[in-house]
């Protein structure tokens, strides 16, 4: 049998194709078949043993590694030889938990951004696009790879589809859907972060059966069930979380919380915000085995990646905190690959794996000179050298803001009871984790309850993007939004259901901003003093844009510049990363997962006004 015939293309991972690929790699490793390319490097890091070897050679066949060893000792024929004697080779970096949607780039352009920064494979935590178009989720994530993009994307369908039983539209996943996803592709690694903790522990929660159905379907396929344990810091809850089979947490905030979760078997995915303190503490604690720790960028935007880097930046932060560079590299490579059960394909410079290599000019500073992916060079410095597939995303990806009417100022009015000069109002703040809302007495004018600038109280709204009717829920929020008259900000990124949110000093400005978003199929819209001052286009899913990161960043910088001309209300909260100025993080203030209690969602059957306690299902009027 001539195995050289009909060797499958190796873009996707398929069991039948994998056998043929491996058969060819065996003969190539033995020197019985010619290899495509050999890369000779000054030294090479074996992440399995955390040891360096000098003057090594990596031999590629197709997109895979066929052989690794001392330079000059490979016995077979090589079509092309490349010499990099001054550089150190480490495996391509992996994102253990990332929402590519938060880069606001489509996958093909995400690849062009992150590959030069070492990121060659990503476990896509897919509950953003899946909440917009759940039926097309895997198709969306695989399309760029099928067209030749070097970035390997391993999707995890979202457990939070919908995030709670009180949210609707765009997608719905249960056990049957997850079982189908796990069967569809070996590149589906499991279930995206389980966030609705009340639905895990409480059998009376309306999402209990749906969520456990998805967990069970993932177990049945030996997939990984990712966790989200924000706010769970007491030992009973941590033990219960681990007992549920939720394998990880990327929400740790303190060293003690990290230790308690690590020692109960959770895989820890560290974000940069708490990394210096946590890593320094773990080093002082004498942690010997770092194999249960990885680094994650989670929701990093394209603008921040251009400024800081991708997961390479996280590793530099860890190294600056005292972690050995070799351990930091393991946290980007073999550790996430083991956790996601992907070691046959990624995570190390070893035969059978994809030919993903990061070439470092300075290991201690993690300075990246080149990146190779799929056995070929794809970047030099931060310049991407590869081709970007030109994808004309179809209507199912680009026509997702379904509002078939003009939104009007009166949609945001909160009518007062007849004859009243004041009304009581329920008020919350961004990242309001308190078990109760605030109550304020607000003035009535022209039959409607009014904002109160003197108390930093403005109006916040959610506009349904799915039904076609543009249903609106609205209430008063404190410590956010514009003081500038006739000013509003609206955005179609509203984690995790991704309806449209708007905050404004007037109802008319809010309507104008929302209508601008509908016209461009999502993104940002800023109305300042009655005029549309800036927009940013997220035309794919209302979450992403199909263009270069630099072009998107230029539009974002223009938005920020216009935003600096607005007087924004601000009050600090106990939630980290809520800053004065342009309130970009309101995108995340609409979350409904633990530890949130009282939230505003789009109008639903259980909460016609949209104001509901997601821990208990209790509702309350927004004014009375």
From Swiss-Prot:
Gene3D superfamilies named in the record: Metal-dependent hydrolases, Urease, subunit C, domain 1
EC number annotated for this UniProt entry: 3.5.4.2
EC top class, as a word: hydrolase
Cofactor(s) the record lists: Mn(2+)
GO process annotations (BP): adenine catabolic process
SUPFAM superfamilies associated with the record: Composite domain of metallo-dependent hydrolases, Metallo-dependent hydrolases
Keyword terms: Hydrolase, Manganese
InterPro entries on file: Adenine_deam, Adenine_deam_C, Amidohydro-rel, Metal-dep_hydrolase_composite, Metal_Hydrolase
Catalysed reactions, semicolon-separated: adenine + H2O + H(+) = hypoxanthine + NH4(+)
Recorded GO MF terms: adenine deaminase activity
Source taxon at top rank: Bacteria
Entry similarity comment: Belongs to the metallo-dependent hydrolases superfamily. Adenine deaminase family.
Protein's recorded name: Adenine deaminase 1
């Amino acid at each position: 049998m001539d195995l050289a015939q009909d060797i499958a293309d190796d873009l996707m991972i398929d069991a039948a194709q994998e056998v043929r690929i491996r058969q060819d790699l065996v003969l190539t490793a033995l020197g019985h078949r010619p290899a495509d390319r050999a890369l000779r490097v000054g030294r090479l890091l074996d992440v399995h043993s955390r040891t360096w070897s000098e003057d090594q050679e990596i031999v590629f066949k197709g997109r895979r590694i066929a052989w690794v060893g001392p330079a000059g000792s490979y016995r077979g024929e090589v079509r092309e030889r490349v010499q990099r004697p001054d550089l150190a080779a480490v495996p391509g970096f992996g994102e253990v938990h990332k929402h590519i949607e938060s880069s606001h780039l489509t996958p093909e352009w995400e690849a062009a951004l992150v590959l030069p920064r070492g990121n060659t494979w990503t476990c896509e935590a897919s509950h953003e696009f899946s909440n917009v178009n759940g039926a097309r989720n895997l198709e969306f994530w695989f399309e760029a790879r099928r067209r030749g993009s070097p970035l390997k994307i391993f999707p995890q369908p979202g457990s939070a589809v919908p995030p709670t039983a009180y949210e609707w539209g765009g997608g719905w996943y249960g056990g049957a859907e997850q079982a189908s996803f796990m069967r569809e592709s070996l590149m589906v690694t499991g279930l995206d972060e389980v966030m609705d903790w009340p639905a895990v522990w409480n059998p009376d929660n309306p999402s209990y059966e749906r969520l456990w159905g998805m967990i069970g379907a993932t177990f049945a396929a030996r997939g990984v069930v990712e966790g989200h344990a924000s706010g769970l810091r007491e030992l009973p809850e941590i033990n219960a979380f681990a007992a549920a089979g939720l394998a990880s947490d990327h929400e740790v905030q303190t060293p003690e919380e990290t230790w308690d979760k690590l020692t109960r078997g959770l895989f820890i995915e560290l974000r940069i915000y708490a990394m210096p303190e946590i890593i320094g503490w773990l080093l002082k604690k004498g942690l010997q085995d770092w194999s249960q720790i990885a680094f994650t960028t989670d929701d990093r935007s394209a603008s921040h990646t251009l400024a800081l880097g991708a997961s390479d930046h996280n590793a530099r932060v860890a190294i600056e905190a005292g972690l050995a560079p070799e351990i930091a590299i393991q946290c980007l490579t073999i550790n996430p690959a083991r956790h996601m059960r992907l070691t046959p394909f990624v995570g190390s410079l070893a035969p059978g794996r994809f030919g993903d290599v990061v070439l470092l000019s300075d290991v201690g500073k993690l300075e990246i000179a080149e990146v190779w992916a799929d056995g070929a060079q794809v970047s030099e410095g931060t310049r991407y050298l590869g081709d970007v597939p030109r994808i004309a995303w179809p209507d199912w990806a680009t026509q997702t803001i379904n509002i078939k009417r003009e939104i009007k100022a009166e949609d945001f009015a909160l009518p007062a009871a007849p004859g009243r000069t004041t009304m009581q109002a329920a008020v919350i703040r961004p990242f309001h984790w308190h078990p109760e809302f605030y109550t304020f007495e607000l003035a009535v004018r022209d039959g409607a309850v009014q904002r109160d600038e003197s108390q930093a109280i403005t109006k916040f709204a959610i506009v349904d993007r799915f039904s076609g009717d543009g249903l609106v829920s609205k209430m008063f929020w404190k410590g956010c939004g514009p003081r500038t008259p006739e000013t509003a900000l609206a955005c179609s990124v509203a984690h995790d259901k991704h309806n449209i949110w708007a905050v404004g000093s007037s109802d008319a400005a809010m309507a104008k901003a929302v209508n601008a978003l509908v016209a461009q199929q999502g993104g940002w819209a800023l109305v300042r003093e009655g005029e549309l001052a800036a927009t940013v286009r997220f035309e794919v899913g209302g979450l992403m844009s199909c263009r270069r990161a630099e072009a998107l960043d230029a539009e974002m910088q223009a938005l920020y510049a216009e935003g600096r001309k607005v007087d924004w209300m601000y009050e600090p909260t106990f939630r980290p990363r809520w800053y004065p100025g342009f309130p970009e993080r309101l995108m995340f203030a609409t979350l409904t997962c633990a530890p949130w209690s009282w939230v505003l969602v789009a109008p639903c059957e259980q909460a016609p006004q949209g104001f509901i306690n997601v821990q208990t299902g209790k509702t309350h009027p927004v004014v009375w």
